[in-house]
């Protein structure tokens, strides 16, 4: 890990850990837990879905059975989109802003390096969270899809999903997004 990556990755890890732990206090059974960022690699937030939240969403919105899989993994429809962002991600925002002031956005090579570093920091954080066992709270880990996802999604989401999860455990997600 590079010296530039470590502080950013650790800050994202700490913020996401606090947000996920607070969220998991509700005792619901989670199957979707992600860090989200934009195609510009802005500061990430978390999003999550639980079995119980999906059931409430489907019932409240009269979602037809055949459409449920599309909502099941939709960060935009998640009631837990950006959960804990204001409370826990302020240091992350500050670090990103500090890095922004050092970047020449007209220099494509410099921007690509920064973009890749930011995504690597997010992947580092989600892997570190996984290693702590956090995604096994309230449900077995193999039932939880984890990832660093982009808004809007792109093919790199699939690559990261396969590196962070057992492909057998995310068959449904893969059938929708690949």
Roles of regions detected by a PLM:
Residues 3, 7, 11, 83, ...:
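Alpha-helix boundary/N-cap detector
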Residues 54-115:
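Polybasic, proline/glycine-rich intrinsically disordered low-complexity segments
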Residues 27, 67, 138-140:
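A short, structural micro-pattern
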Residues 23-64:
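N-terminal interaction modules that seed assembly of large macromolecular complexes
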Residues 11, 15, 19, 91, ...:
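Charge-rich, solvent-exposed alpha-helical interaction surfaces
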Residues 131-178:
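Glycine-rich, aromatic-bearing surface loops/beta-hairpins
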Residues 1-30:
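Short N-terminal edge-element motif at the start of the domain
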């Amino acid at each position: 890990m590079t010296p530039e990556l470590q502080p950013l990755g650790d800050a994202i890890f700490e913020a996401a850990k606090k947000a996920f732990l607070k969220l998991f206090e509700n005792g619901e059974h989670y199957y979707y837990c992600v860090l989200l960022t934009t195609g510009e690699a802005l500061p990430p937030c978390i999003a999550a879905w639980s079995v119980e939240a999906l059931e409430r969403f489907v019932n409240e919105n009269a979602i037809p059975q055949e459409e449920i899989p599309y909502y099941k993994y939709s960060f935009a429809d998640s009631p837990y989109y950006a959960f804990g962002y204001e409370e826990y991600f302020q240091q992350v925002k500050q670090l990103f802003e500090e890095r922004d002031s050092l970047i020449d956005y007209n220099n494509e090579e410099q921007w690509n390096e920064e973009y890749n570093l930011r995504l690597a920091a997010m992947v580092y954080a989600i892997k570190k969270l996984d290693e702590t066992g956090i995604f096994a709270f309230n449900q077995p880990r193999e039932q939880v899809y984890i990832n660093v996802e982009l808004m809007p999604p792109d093919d790199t989401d699939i690559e990261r999903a396969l590196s962070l999860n057992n492909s057998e455990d995310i068959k449904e997600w893969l059938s929708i997004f690949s």
